Design a protein with these regions (language model features):
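Class I SAM-dependent methyltransferase SAM/SAH-binding core
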Residues: 60-108
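A conserved beta-strand element that flanks and buttresses the S-adenosyl-L-methionine
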Residues: 120
Length: 232
């Protein structure tokens, strides 16, 4: 799909580390993501082998590949070709046939075929400024069936303006000292300075305005949030 000239370039907002083959090769070890909790949530919401799931911002495919045995098909979408190359290596090694990798993003992925049952996104929406978050959420709603589920997990600030300095400093103080084992203070500072995490009290009205009912909300440590949303 040709995008209007006034659309932002998602590749420019992807984060340079996600386009760096060296970083991507160590991404799974650094992020240490366990998909079990989120997969359990979706299965309790009814995810089964008749369903199609779209994973937006799929990265190296940790969640997509874990979800594949429980779905008819998984569409793993990411703007980074380096991430998708890593995903494909893992898919081939694990012998998984029902995961399709697609280069694209929240604004550029065009879903073809029937509306899907589930959309999943983890730690990706924050790469977009708030205006474009709304565009992205509206596009997600358009690809979901009525009653379909969006499970969104991201860095979302669930605190009041007067608490900004205290909570951000506390978060930074807990950063990893080893860049191979976790996110360092410098990397977390870059997130705050250059990426677009928003407040929960801004994101939640966006979800509602884009046609979702928020059925469950979880906040962890004032920085991380998860939303279960059903398309109206």
């Amino acid at each position: 799909m040709a995008l209007p000239n006034w659309f932002i370039d998602e590749m420019a907002h992807a984060g340079s580390e996600h386009l760096d083959p060296g970083h991507v090769s160590g991404y799974d070890h650094k992020s240490a993501t366990d998909p079990t909790e989120d997969l359990d949530v979706l299965r309790k919401l009814g995810l089964n082998e008749t369903h199609t799931l779209v994973d937006l911002g799929a990265g190296t495919g940790t969640f997509s590949l874990a979800a594949a045995p429980f779905c008819r098909s998984v569409i793993a979408v990411d703007v980074s070709p380096q991430m998708l190359t890593q995903l494909e290596h893992k898919r081939e090694e694990e012998g998984i046939a029902n995961v399709e990798s697609v280069q694209g993003g929240f604004l550029s992925y065009t879903h073809e075929g029937e509306p899907v049952d589930f959309v999943y996104s983890r730690h990706a929406l924050h790469h977009l400024p708030d205006f474009w978050k709304v565009v992205a959420l509206d596009r997600i709603a358009a690809m979901l069936k009525s009653g379909g589920v969006l499970f969104l997990r991201d860095l979302v600030y669930s605190f009041e303006p007067a608490e900004i300095e205290r909570i951000i400093e506390s978060w930074l103080a807990g950063a990893s000292k080893n860049p191979e084992l976790g996110w360092t203070r410098k990397e977390l500072e870059t997130h705050v300075c250059e990426e677009y995490s928003t407040f929960s009290w801004l994101l939640e009205p966006m979800l509602q305005r884009c046609g979702f009912t928020i059925t469950d909300t979880e906040h962890r440590g004032s920085i991380y949030s998860a939303y279960t949303c059903v398309k109206n």
